C-alpha cells in the first residue's frame, strides 16, 4: 500500500515538473518571436506581405478578410479574393440583400467622362474611396462597358454569396471592421 502511494506521489511530482518545463519553454519561445511590423499600407510591409489590421501579414486575401472583418460570412463557393490598395475585392460575389449589410444597398448613377479612361467599375471604386467613412463597401453589377454601381453604408458584418457578373469590394483596415 505504501509503495502505491509513493508511486502516485512520484508520478504527480514528475507531471508537475513536466508541466512547468513546458510552460517555461512556451513562454521563452513567445519572447523570441520578433514583434509584428506595424503598418498603415502595404508599402510599409516586406515582399509578399500585406497590411492587415495594422500589422504586416503573409495571410491569403481570404484569410485576411476573415481577420479584418471578424464576423463576415462567406459562401463556400467563394474561394479567393484580391488585395487592392484600399479594398478586398471579390469577383462573382454579391452581398446577401436579405441580411442587414445587404439591405443598405443603394444604386449610384455612374457616367464615366469620355475624356477619362476609367471604366465604370473603377469610377464606382473611386466613389467609395473618395466618399465619407460611411462607405462600408461597393458592388458593381455588369460588364466593363456598362453596369450598375451600388454603395453600402451599414457597419453590420457582410454576408457574401456567389453572384455571377458581380464584383464586390470591402474596405481594408476600415473603422467599421
Swiss-Prot record:
Originating organism: African swine fever virus (isolate Tick/South Africa/Pretoriuskop Pr4/1996) (ASFV)
Membrane topology, record value: Single-pass membrane protein
UniProt induction comment: Expressed in the late phase of the viral replicative cycle.
Main location: virion
Superkingdom of source: Viruses
Localisation per UniProt entry: Virion membrane; Host cell membrane
Family: Belongs to the asfivirus inner membrane protein p22 family.
Name the record gives this protein: Inner membrane protein p22
GO cellular component terms, A-Z: host cell plasma membrane; membrane; virion membrane
Amino acid at each position: 500500500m505504501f509503495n502505491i502511494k509513493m508511486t502516485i506521489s512520484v508520478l504527480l511530482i514528475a507531471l508537475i515538473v513536466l508541466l512547468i518545463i513546458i510552460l517555461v519553454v512556451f513562454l521563452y519561445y513567445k519572447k523570441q518571436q520578433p514583434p509584428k511590423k506595424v503598418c498603415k499600407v502595404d508599402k510599409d510591409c516586406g515582399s509578399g506581405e500585406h497590411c492587415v489590421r495594422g500589422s504586416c501579414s503573409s495571410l491569403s486575401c481570404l484569410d485576411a478578410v476573415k481577420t479584418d472583418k471578424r464576423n463576415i460570412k462567406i459562401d463556400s463557393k467563394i474561394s479567393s479574393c484580391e488585395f487592392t490598395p484600399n479594398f478586398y475585392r471579390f469577383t462573382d460575389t454579391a452581398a446577401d440583400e436579405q441580411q442587414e449589410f445587404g439591405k443598405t444597398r443603394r444604386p449610384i448613377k455612374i457616367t464615366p467622362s469620355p475624356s477619362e479612361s476609367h471604366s465604370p467599375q473603377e469610377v464606382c471604386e473611386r466613389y467609395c474611396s473618395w466618399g465619407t467613412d460611411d462607405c462600408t463597401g461597393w458592388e458593381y453589377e455588369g460588364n466593363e462597358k456598362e453596369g450598375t454601381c451600388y454603395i453600402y453604408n451599414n457597419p453590420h458584418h457582410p454576408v457574401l454569396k456567389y453572384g455571377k457578373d458581380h464584383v464586390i469590394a470591402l474596405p481594408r483596415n476600415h473603422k467599421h471592421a
